[in-house]
Amino acid sequence: TVIAVLAATHACENKLQTAIMAPTELLAEQHYMNFTNWLSPINIKTAWLSSRVTGKRRNAELERIKAGQAEVIIGTHALFQNDVEFNNLGLVIIDEQHRFGVHQRLALREKGVSRNTSPHQLVMTATPIPRTLSMSVYADLDVSVIDELPPGRKPVTTTIVPDERRNSVIKRVADACSKGRQVYWVCTLIEESETLQCQAAEVTAQQLSKL
């Protein structure tokens, strides 16, 4: 994310807009908040587009983007819709690039090509398979791999616990929270599915909050 911010800043210094696309509204909104907090002190204007941005607010954002008043535009698939016009798109950043199809990534890039420019692209992923494939499929891209832990980062210990010991895991989570520490509980789905028998984040959050 820091690399993406620095790249966007460099584009802004050259009077070019940056589009940052994420696969989910949650991730895109996190990026919007972070980028706004980091860039607003240096007078770089951000904009936000997603399916939740509708009506007058959406029209206002579209006008800012078209006029070049928004320099860094963050959003989801909404970024490459037909009514989105960039003033001078020079950089496209795609987070979790394996979550987007080729035509979707191309549609966003074409927003800059239509202005007689070819935007630079920065694609990011933390998933091993797309990262490995990129070295053979994307022969025209430079690949950077971050293979070192940040200074001071403690090693992670991975332990497999059967579902029968779920209560003991919950107890360890409660103990950690009582000490003011943070716990990440990752689920396969966000909402319950009628076809997939997988743990849903919304249901799990409700269950844990009652303990």
Please give the residue ranges for each predicted region:
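Inter-lobe coupling/hinge segments of SF2-like helicase ATPases
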Residues: 1-211
